[in-house]
C-alpha cells in the first residue's frame, strides 16, 4: 500500500471527520480508481472504533438511470437513501470517475429532475447533519485535465491533500476576523467590477474538515445586494459540459444577463429555479500548492489568489436565505498570470494581484502556508 494513501486515510478519519468509537461512517466511492483509498479508510475507521458502510457507484450506470428516470423512481430512491444518510454520523465521498464528461449529453430537463427530486434533499441532509468530507482521487482522467503525467499529478495531489491543515486553520483566523467586521466588498479586475454587502452573515473557514484539498474562507452576500459584472477566467465543468468565458451581470442580487461559450446552455442552468439566479456563497481561495485551473471544482475553488462567487443554494451555516437545487462554484483568479485584480473590504485594499497586502493577512500568502 502506498504510504501516502495510508496518510490520507488517517487524515480523513482522524482530522476531517474526527471519527469516534461507535460512530457510523458512509464511504461513497465513484469509479474504479479510488478502491485502494476505500480499503485504507475501512481499516482506519475500524481502528478508530467506528463502523464503515461502503457504497460503490458507477457513472455509466448513473447516466443510464438518469436518462430514463422519472418522479416515481426518484421519490423512492430519495426515501431509501435519505433513510440511510440519517443513520450516519459521518460521510466520506470520493470521486474517481474515468470520464468527467459522462453526463454531458443528458438533456437539461432530465438533469434538473434528477437534481430536484433526488440529489438536492440528500445533499442538504448530508451537509447539514453529518460530519462530512469530499475529495477526488488521482487517476489518468484527472492527470489529463491537469495536462500532466499520472506520476506528476499524484505527487501534486498528495502534496496538496496531505499538507498541514492545522497550520492553515490558525492562519485563517485573521481573515475570518476581517470579514466578520466587513460590511461592503468590492472586487475589480479584467472585465469585473462587482460590489455587494455581507451584513451579519457568518464567516466560515475551511481547512480540511469538509473538502480535500481545502483552503478557503467563505460567507455569503446579502441576497439582493449584488450589483455589477463579473468575468470568470477559470473553466467550469457542470454536468459534464465545460463552460468558458462566463460573464454575469447582476442587478439587486439577480443575474440579469449571462453569457458564455454556450450562452443558451448556461441560461438553462440559471433557469433551474428562482434561486439559481442569485448567489449563495462568496469565498476566498488560499491553497499555496494550487496555482492553476484543472477543470475540477474541488481544486480550482482553492487556487491561491482566487475567489469564487457561487450562484445557487447557500449553506446553512452561512446562509443569506437563498434556496436552489444548484450550487455552482464559479472561480475567478486574480494572480498576475490571469490578469490581476483587486479586492476591497469597506474601501480598504486588502488583496492585490492575488496577494494579501495588509499586515494581518500576510500570514495567508503562499510562502507562509507551505
Question: Predicted segments — roles?
Answer:
Residues 257-323:
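Dual-mode signal for accessory low-complexity, basic/Gly-rich regions
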Residues 1-228, 359, 364-369:
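Active-site bordering "gate/hinge" segments
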Residues 32, 97-99, 139, 201, ...:
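Short, glycine-/Ser/Thr-/acidic-enriched flexible segments
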Residues 224-268:
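Long, well-ordered mid-to-C-terminal structural blocks that present hydrophobic/aromatic surfaces
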Residues 187, 249, 343:
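Short aromatic-centered micro-motifs
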Amino acid at each position: 500500500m502506498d504510504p501516502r494513501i495510508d496518510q490520507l486515510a488517517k487524515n480523513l478519519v482522524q482530522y476531517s471527520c474526527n471519527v469516534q468509537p461507535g460512530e457510523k461512517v458512509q464511504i461513497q466511492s465513484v469509479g474504479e480508481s479510488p478502491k485502494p483509498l476505500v480499503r485504507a479508510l475501512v481499516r482506519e475507521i475500524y481502528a478508530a472504533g467506528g463502523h464503515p458502510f461502503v457504497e460503490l457507484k458507477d457513472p455509466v450506470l448513473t447516466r443510464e438511470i438518469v436518462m430514463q428516470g422519472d418522479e416515481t423512481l426518484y421519490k423512492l430512491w430519495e426515501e431509501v437513501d435519505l433513510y440511510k444518510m440519517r443513520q450516519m454520523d459521518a460521510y466520506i465521498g470520493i470521486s474517481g470517475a474515468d470520464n468527467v464528461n459522462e453526463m454531458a449529453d443528458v438533456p437539461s430537463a432530465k438533469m434538473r429532475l434528477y437534481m430536484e427530486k433526488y440529489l438536492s434533499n440528500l445533499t442538504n441532509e448530508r451537509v447539514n447533519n453529518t460530519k462530512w468530507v469530499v475529495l477526488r482521487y488521482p487517476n489518468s482522467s484527472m492527470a489529463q485535465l491537469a495536462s500532466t503525467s499520472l506520476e506528476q499529478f499524484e505527487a501534486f495531489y498528495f502534496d496538496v491533500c496531505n499538507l498541514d491543515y492545522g497550520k492553515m486553520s490558525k492562519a485563517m483566523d485573521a481573515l475570518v476576523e476581517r470579514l466578520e467586521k466587513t460590511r461592503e466588498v468590492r472586487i475589480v479586475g479584467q472585465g469585473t467590477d462587482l460590489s455587494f454587502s455581507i451584513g451579519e452573515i457568518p464567516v466560515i473557514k475551511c481547512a480540511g474538515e469538509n473538502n480535500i484539498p481545502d483552503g478557503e474562507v467563505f460567507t455569503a452576500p446579502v441576497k439582493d445586494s449584488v450589483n455589477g459584472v463579473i468575468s470568470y477566467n477559470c473553466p467550469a465543468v457542470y454536468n459534464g459540459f465545460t463552460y468558458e468565458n462566463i460573464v454575469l451581470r447582476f442587478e439587486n442580487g439577480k443575474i440579469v444577463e449571462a453569457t458564455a461559450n454556450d450562452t443558451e446552455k448556461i441560461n438553462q442552468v440559471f433557469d433551474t429555479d428562482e434561486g439559481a439566479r442569485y448567489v449563495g456563497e462568496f469565498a476566498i481561495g488560499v491553497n499555496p500548492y494550487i496555482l492553476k485551473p484543472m477543470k475540477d471544482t474541488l481544486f480550482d475553488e482553492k487556487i491561491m489568489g482566487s475567489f469564487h462567487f457561487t450562484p445557487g443554494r447557500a449553506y446553512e451555516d452561512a446562509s443569506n436565505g437563498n434556496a436552489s437545487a444548484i450550487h455552482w462554484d464559479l472561480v475567478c483568479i486574480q494572480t498576475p498570470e490571469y490578469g490581476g485584480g483587486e479586492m476591497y473590504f469597506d474601501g480598504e485594499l486588502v488583496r492585490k494581484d492575488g496577494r494579501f497586502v495588509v499586515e494581518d493577512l500576510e500570514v495567508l500568502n503562499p510562502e507562509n502556508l507551505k
